[in-house]
């Protein structure tokens, strides 16, 4: 009987402890919930305070106001220092009517006819930042619209702030041999790997690259890891687009002899990481994109430039020849082994550009773009003080231009609707650019209905 009582006592104690633990757990959860609610309320209050503060100062700003009409930076208000000049930068559109507002900044991809700061007052300057593909907003690539802007920062070398080398950190990154593998090892890997690799998941873009590469694959083996023309899998942790700069991804690409570096659009100066990546890894890029690419290559023989007027079969034959001839192949890597950049234009651009890439010691190109506009605003303020006429900046057609998309005429078993769309989209954007320029000339607000009526009566 005594032993049974002890067992009952132990059971009771265990139950009591468990109950106490549950009570304490619920109390902790409740306290955490209260804390989170309080913190959430405080965050909301802080955000509301910022909004109130920003709105409270709408009439108090003593510096030139520059409004990001596209919410690229997300900053409600910031006093930026640009050398000896200061400007107030904000995404708050209520500053449109502020007497100190001097300029509006637009991000090309977000530029929309549905929201424009109109009417455009005499002192209002427009500035365009657009470093991306023309397919993001074809309207901007036509003379009637691009010339509506006063200041530009685009991939074109002719823009006021050229961003042509936006994907290239510096010369040292280009000449480094961190990922360069011996050719003898690459030859050994050819037992299991194709000589050529392709990695793209943005299929059927305006450059029609997938059509060309599909035909090329009929004549030479290509390992395709992306969603486009896929025939080989990446490890699971590398399948997301955010892994394109992962060291493991670099190691896979570095094993190949050739990388197909085909841009999604064919425009002068439109050069992306598709070119720079293989050059940094010590792989020979087979490049199709900017027609003036030789202006930017580190060496005259650092890439194989695709001639779109020649059949892919001819390119395949050339790649096969290089694959079998080490001496000829190594000519394309001689600059890499010597760590020698012979292109004076590229060296000059990287030395003189006023911004850096992934470099905390330099300003980024968005900050430099803002300061370019700020400095020009102040230049005219000083000219006005000296009773001089204002200086006028105006974008030119060359600041953002690209020819119509051109499809390859290879026989296709199937053709996507997206592939067929780009030509029509380009022509439509041309009409839209003309119509919008006409509407802007009236300098009054307009409705979407009025705009489309102008488009279709053009």
UniProtKB/Swiss-Prot annotation:
Glycans are attached at residues 92, 150, 300, 445. It catalyses: L-threonyl-[protein] + GDP-beta-L-fucose = 3-O-(alpha-L-fucosyl)-L-threonyl-[protein] + GDP + H(+); L-seryl-[protein] + GDP-beta-L-fucose = 3-O-(alpha-L-fucosyl)-L-seryl-[protein] + GDP + H(+). One of its GO terms (molecular function) is alpha-(1->3)-fucosyltransferase activity. Its main location: endoplasmic reticulum. It is a single-pass type II membrane protein. Residues 33-458 are lumenal. This is GDP-fucose protein O-fucosyltransferase 3. It comes from Danio rerio (Zebrafish).
């Amino acid at each position: 009987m005594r032993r049974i009582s002890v067992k009952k006592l132990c059971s009771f104690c265990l139950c009591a402890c468990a109950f106490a633990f549950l009570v304490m757990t619920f109390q902790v959860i409740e306290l955490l919930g209260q804390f989170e609610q309080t913190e959430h309320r405080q965050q909301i209050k802080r955000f509301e305070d910022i909004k109130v503060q920003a709105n409270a100062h709408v009439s108090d700003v003593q510096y030139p106001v520059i409004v990001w009409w596209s919410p690229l930076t997300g900053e409600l208000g910031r006093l930026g220092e640009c050398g000896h000049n200061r400007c107030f930068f904000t995404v708050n559109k209520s500053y449109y009517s502020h007497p100190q507002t001097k300029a509006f900044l637009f991000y090309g991809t977000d530029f929309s006819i549905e929201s424009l700061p109109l009417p455009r007052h005499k002192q209002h300057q427009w500035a365009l930042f657009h470093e991306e593909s023309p397919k993001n907003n074809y309207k901007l690539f036509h003379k009637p619209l691009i010339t509506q802007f006063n200041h530009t920062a685009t991939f074109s070398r002719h823009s006021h702030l050229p961003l042509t080398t936006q994907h290239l950190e510096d010369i040292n990154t280009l000449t480094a041999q961190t990922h360069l593998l011996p050719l003898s090892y690459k030859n050994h890997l050819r037992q299991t790997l194709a000589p050529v690799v392709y990695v793209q998941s943005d299929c059927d873009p305006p450059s029609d690259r997938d059509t060309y590469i599909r035909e090329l694959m009929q004549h030479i083996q290509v390992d395709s890891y992306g969603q486009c023309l896929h025939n080989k899998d990446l490890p699971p942790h590398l399948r997301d687009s955010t892994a394109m700069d992962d060291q493991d991804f670099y190691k896979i690409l570095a094993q190949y002899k050739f990388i197909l570096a085909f841009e999604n659009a064919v425009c002068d100066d439109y050069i992306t990481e598709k070119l720079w990546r293989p050059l940094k890894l010590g792989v020979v890029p087979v490049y199709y994109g900017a027609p003036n690419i030789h202006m930017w290559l580190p060496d005259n023989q650092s890439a194989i430039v695709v001639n779109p007027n020649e059949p892919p079969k001819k390119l395949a034959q050339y790649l096969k020849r290089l694959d079998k001839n080490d001496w000829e192949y190594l000519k394309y890597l001689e600059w890499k082994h010597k760590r020698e950049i012979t292109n004076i234009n590229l060296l000059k651009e990287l030395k003189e550009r006023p911004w850096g890439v992934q470099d905390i010691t330099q300003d980024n190109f968005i900050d430099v773009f803002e300061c370019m506009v700020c400095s020009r605003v102040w230049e005219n303020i000083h000219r006005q003080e000296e009773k001089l006429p204002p200086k006028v900046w105006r974008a030119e057609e060359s600041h953002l231009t690209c020819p119509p998309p051109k499809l390859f005429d290879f026989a296709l078993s199937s053709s996507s609707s997206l592939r067929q769309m780009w030509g029509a989209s380009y022509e439509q954007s041309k009409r839209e650019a003309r119509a919008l320029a006409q509407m802007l000339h009236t300098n009054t607000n307009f409705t979407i209905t009025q705009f489309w009526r102008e488009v279709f009566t053009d």
